Amino acid sequence: MILSDADILDRLAEGDLVVEPLDDVDQQVQPASVDLRLGERFLEFQRTNIPCIHPTEADEVGDYVTETRVPEGEEFILHPGDFVLGTTTERVEIPPDLLATVQGRSSLGRLAIVIHATAGIVDPGYKGQITLELSNLGTAPVALTPGMRVSQLIFTELKSPAKRPYGVERGSKYQDQDGPQASRIGSDPEFHSDENQAAEHES
């Protein structure tokens, strides 16, 4: 079941669902979603001539991105073909019985701005800001202003609460994130199978 505006307001009032700061409830709470605003921090991917990026090598990923801060009221220009990581202004806390989905606002979609590439799911138990995968599929640069509403968060009630919500187990590598976070795929267990086997052998 997808939560309506009345359901969302009830859960926010109960305190187990958190979206903060929610500065303008009338404007941000939509019929079945909450509008989230663009934060001030961006991770830009550098032009590079190296043969490839190895996602499992944290140093390579870190060298590939630089952080830019754009104060509210100023503009971040997203050029055609560019891809950057942004963040929401709001910090969220998703209770174990809800799943959240991030969608871009249609008004930006009509300007060829994509808000997320693949990461549309916010797991039960997640706490933190949400990283946005911003790209410009159009032919003209588009000015994005921190503080503008860029995405919608939709909440679906689960049939039963998650037994292992995000943050409970190892591997919750983006829990409590502050600002945009580059890929941490290198910490996934499948890339450390030899280490895991060695640890099991020693024990």
Swiss-Prot record:
GO terms for molecular function: dCTP deaminase activity; nucleotide binding. One of its GO terms (biological process) is nucleobase-containing small molecule interconversion. The active site is at E133. Keywords: Hydrolase, Nucleotide metabolism, Nucleotide-binding. It comes from the Archaea. Pathway: Pyrimidine metabolism; dUMP biosynthesis; dUMP from dCTP (dUTP route): step 1/2. It is an enzyme of class 3 (hydrolase). Catalyzes the deamination of dCTP to dUTP. Homotrimer. Belongs to the dCTP deaminase family. This is dCTP deaminase. It comes from Halorubrum lacusprofundi (strain ATCC 49239 / DSM 5036 / JCM 8891 / ACAM 34).
